[in-house]
């Protein structure tokens, strides 16, 4: 009997350890939503390649504007995106976080004041997160957090938005915060916000910026990576284009990534994995690198 008890306890400890490892291990993060031909959200999650999927984008908001979600060819958020609710739940039931990205490389967005930031935070909470609203474009699904992909403006008030969103972590569902800065440090738009220490994940865009991206040599990228690991964030991710067509420059062939870059950056205590832009361009890249991430 004693031997059986020990065996059971040993098996339980192994399961707990495995759960801990899977919940704290590295992952591939993917942006989804900007191409109607990239497949469904459920299929994206069911691929088994991604640990987090980011819905892109709420590209209009702030400064008196009515916030607007743009999911390109997938659906019209004003009328028929409720069908995504079941897909979101499918992802979450598989242990995959689903975040909503605000901003993007195009669109009209800005924050004019702290009050504006607080108002927008309440809107995000009530419309997409754990709050309540008569209008929820994605139905009753509760997203896991908000991603800041801010690529224009002077950087003011994004720290206030982060504080306001974090303020909703009041014992209810956790609101994860992520940021996608450009690789030159400091980032003109997001460094002040990241300095609050409120961000769980920072996936740095190591592309479209030759001084800090891969270009036959990994030296510039690795130097920039080392600088980014000093910022106040729980985890830092290597942000890359998923193909040569996904960005103007900075694509790293899978064999170069796995031999020249990942072995070094995985030694960083804050290493979280790889972020890819985007699902529409990921025609096998994530599968090729998954085992090395």
Swiss-Prot record:
Induction remark: By fungal infection.
GO biological process: chitin catabolic process; polysaccharide catabolic process
Pfam families registered for this protein in UniProt: Glyco_hydro_18 (PF00704)
Listed GO MF terms: endochitinase activity
Catalyzed reactions per annotation: Random endo-hydrolysis of N-acetyl-beta-D-glucosaminide (1->4)-beta-linkages in chitin and chitodextrins
Superkingdom as given in the UniProt entry: Eukaryota
GO CC list: extracellular region
Intrachain S-S bonds: 45-91, 75-81, 183-212
Signal peptide: 1-25
Protein's recorded name: Acidic endochitinase SE2
Originating organism: Beta vulgaris (Sugar beet)
């Amino acid at each position: 009997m004693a031997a059986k008890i020990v065996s059971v306890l040993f098996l339980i400890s192994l399961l707990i350890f495995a759960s801990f490892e899977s919940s704290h291990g590295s992952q591939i993060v993917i942006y989804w939503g900007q191409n109607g031909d990239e497949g469904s959200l459920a299929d994206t999650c069911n691929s088994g390649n991604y640990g987090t999927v980011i819905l892109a984008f709420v590209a209009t908001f702030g400064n008196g504007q009515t916030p607007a979600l743009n999911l390109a060819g997938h659906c019209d958020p004003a009328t028929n995106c409720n069908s995504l609710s079941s897909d979101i739940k499918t992802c979450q039931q598989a242990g995959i976080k689903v975040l909503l990205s605000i901003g993007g490389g195009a669109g009209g967005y800005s924050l004019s004041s702290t009050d504006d930031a607080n108002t927008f935070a309440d809107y995000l909470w009530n419309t997409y997160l754990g709050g309540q609203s008569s209008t929820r474009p994605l139905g009753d699904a509760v997203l896991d957090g908000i991603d800041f992909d801010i690529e224009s403006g002077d950087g003011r008030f994004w720290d206030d938005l982060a504080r306001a969103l974090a303020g909703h972590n009041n014992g209810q569902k956790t609101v994860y915060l992520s940021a996608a800065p450009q690789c030159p440090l400091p980032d003109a738009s997001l460094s002040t916000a990241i300095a609050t220490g409120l961000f769980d994940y920072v996936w740095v865009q190591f592309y479209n910026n030759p001084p800090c991206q891969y270009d036959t040599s990994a030296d510039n990228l690795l130097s920039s990576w080392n600088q980014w690991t000093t910022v106040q964030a729980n985890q830092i991710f290597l942000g890359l284009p998923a193909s040569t067509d996904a960005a103007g420059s900075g694509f790293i062939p899978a064999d170069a990534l796995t031999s020249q870059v990942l072995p070094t950056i995985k030694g960083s205590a804050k290493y979280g994995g790889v972020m890819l832009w985007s699902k529409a361009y990921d025609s096998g890249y994530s599968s090729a690198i998954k085992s090395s991430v």
